[in-house]
Amino acid sequence: MNANETKVERFLETTKVQFVIPVYQRNYDWKKIQCERLLDDILEVGSNDNLKVHFIGSIVYVHDDAYTTAKINELIIIDGQQRLTTITLIYLALYHLVKSMEEKSLADEIMETYLINKFAEESEKLKLRPTDNNDYALKCLLKDSNHADFESYSTLIANFDLFKKRITKENYQTIRQGLAKLMFVEISLDRSNDDPQRIFESLNSTGLDLSQADLIRNYILMGLSRIDQSKIYQNYWEVIEKFAKDETTNESKVSEFIRDFLTLETKNIPNKGSVYIKFKEKYPNLISSMDELERLLLRIKKLAMHYNKLLNPKKEPDKEIQKQLEYIAQLEINVAYPFLMQVYDDFNNNVIDKSTFISILNLVQSLTWRRFIVGLPTNALNKMFMSLYDKVDKNDYLFSVQKSLLQRSSTQRFPNNTEISNALKEKDVYNIKHKNTMYFLERLENYQNPEYVKIEDCVNITIEHIFPQNPDPKWRMELGIDQCDKIKEFYLNTIGNLTLSGNNGKLGNKSFSEKRNMNVDGKEQGYSYSRFWLNKSLREKTEWNLHEIKERTKMITERFMKIWEYPDIQIKSEDGNGEVNIFEIDDQSDKQLEYYVFCDQRTEVLTTSQLFCNIFKQLFDLQPESFFNTPIKDRINLSNKIEVYENKAYEQLNDTYFMCTNYTNAEKIDRIKEALSILKLEDELFIKYAENESNVYVV
């Protein structure tokens, strides 16, 4: 490796050289603010005689001693392509400006010194060779500053237009002087002696510049030959990038997709900033075998095709499946993607039929929506869906998934109908995410509805409070102050008091009879004239009070049970694996343990004392600072002095700290629960009692 400080001008004026941006590099994506900052720096240094140089970072390239047929030396840029491309655009804007000023000599100098290899073949003429789409855009700009031949959007062209606008007859000489002062560190690597991948990682160790997907793409492609790079990129990675894109926002989701892929492969959920590291750990020798690499990428590409439909439901041609995918997208059930991608693959391979697939999609919604209604934490879903596919029995597909979900307990449970019925009486379903409220009402409205009513995208349909948020005085006269206050405090935003209206602004705070009977110009306005199912029961009502809200809640609850069904299956008690969440333990007698599972790691133990000591040691390793700023410290009598325990039993947590263990088994279990709750790890500890009931212990 050679590193030298070099002037940008000197670097670009090198003859018979081409700076190649390899396919594994991310696309050119400098934003307006970055371009303007660089140009401002150039103007500042160009106008100040006291500033001799301006440092712009580094450019790293691999020198393979590879030459084209025209003896053009190819330098593979592995870091610095954004700066190099942007500076090329500035020179290109300068060229077109001085050309328009009829300064032919200066225009030719800029063109032939910094932009092209004058005597090279057409394909090798540009000194900078970006990836395919940018290469075409750059060639269009070289011919025509108005880029008439380039019809689609290009960041490269947008930034050129910015420079074209800002570089003028008044400042172009200052810009030339500033460009002449630009300095960078030129780092030249020799593939036979240096490790470009390792150097690339060290240059991007902060992760600020590149996404996890960028790093993984580079990891896959960088060590391959140019021919293999092109093959793998075009046949696999480019397709993966296309599939893993949210077409509504035009946002790349490759990093998220690979995270979901690793989740289903490893049964562990990587941190968002560790996806690249975990990918490398899972696949450490990718380029040692092209066959293995292609097999892996073929699987990833196949799953990406299904991921594309989860992100963009309209890509699914079947309208019934598409509708369920739209619901899942509306609820943002992204945590289910590792599971659903595999189910989608089974559907695609005819392992399951359409009916089963739709039932699975409905089941995922039922689980998620029921849990939301009763207020269960969403973080528990991550681990549920992470391993759910492992429970699939392909001979009894739907039942096996239902069984697995119904076997969960505590915060991972599938809420039953009684829980739902109780929750809907009080649940505020108005002051939640608007899209969730609309999902709820849209599904209620359209159950077995022959004419589907699309609510979310219809600006004329709004959520209506039957008893208004700011009631007219007539309400107090009709219901009395006490009942009005009670409804407003406890029932205002419950499902029993919410409906849909195409005229919410007009219904407003009027009395119930006025809301029901409103009919101006014969148009649909009041409840009596509404076509919505949600308003059907309101047509015959003569009053609206607490009793009516409760009755309507019962009616909607019955409909809820039909839409978000609780699986109607029988599960034998022996179907479970015997693992019990620590918070489900009621009987704290001295039964012998077999093992516990904490954070997906199984550990053999026999006694509650062993469990107590092990768990607190693991918790202390995970979050030591939390032991000192929460009640945990006092609950286990944490200290760095042994003498404080006198004749009491104690355990060493680490090299410095100790804790008291002089508690009954019930007290030990209680302290474990308290610590898990404080640290928000309620779903992480499961225990398994020994099956031989004769085995008991004292401590």
Where are these regions (language model features)?
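A cross-family structural signal marking well-folded subdomains
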Residues: 213-216, 221-440
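Intrinsically disordered, charged low-complexity linkers and terminal tails
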Residues: 551, 558-699
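Short active-site loop/helix that positions an aromatic residue
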Residues: 84-100, 468-481, 619
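Secondary-structure capping and boundary motifs in well-ordered enzyme cores
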Residues: 76-83, 176-179, 188-195, 212, ...
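Glycine- and hydrophobic-rich flexible loops that cap the catalytic core of alpha/beta enzyme folds
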Residues: 2-274, 513, 519-533, 537-572
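Intrinsically disordered or highly flexible coil/loop and linker segments, enriched in small
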Residues: 47-51, 100-103, 162, 169-172, ...
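Betabetaalpha-Me/HNH-type nuclease active-site subdomain
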Residues: 44-73, 106, 393-538, 556-557, ...
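Active-site-adjacent bridging/hinge elements
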Residues: 9-16, 52-71, 169-176, 190, ...
